[in-house]
Amino acid sequence: MDSTLDETNELEKISEDDVGTVPEDAFVILDGTRVVPLNQVVVNIGRRIENTIVVDDPRVSRTHAQLRAINGRYIIFDLNSTGGTFVNGKKVDQSILYSGDVISLAGADFIYGQKNPPPRPDLKETLPL
């Protein structure tokens, strides 16, 4: 697995105090209707019943991906899944998640959300017309 993030989602340096800081009011939307609050430092996603989020889809690996709370943000890690992990249509090994990101695990889609999210560093502020 590649140990670096893509250049648009680089991690900032992390202190030990920041590891495990769960983002406030984070959630994922499954199947377009089911809202699952995220309130754990580590969230495992896959077909196995032991996962935090169980996805009943044969395309999804038993232990497909993992969300980790680091520096007040969730970062998704692909766990060497067969079908891959995608964020906004781009295949990733790991990626910082931002509110509104679409996560696809081998075709099973989720939407990551967060109330009052921090700003995205890759989006420039625009002035009103």
What are the residue ranges of the model-derived segments?
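Regulatory inter-domain linker segments that are low-complexity and enriched
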Residues: M1-A26, A108-L129
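Short small/polar-residue motifs
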Residues: N9-D17, D31-R34, S61-A65
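Short polybasic amphipathic segments
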Residues: D25-L30, G83-T85
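Forkhead-associated
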Residues: R34-D109
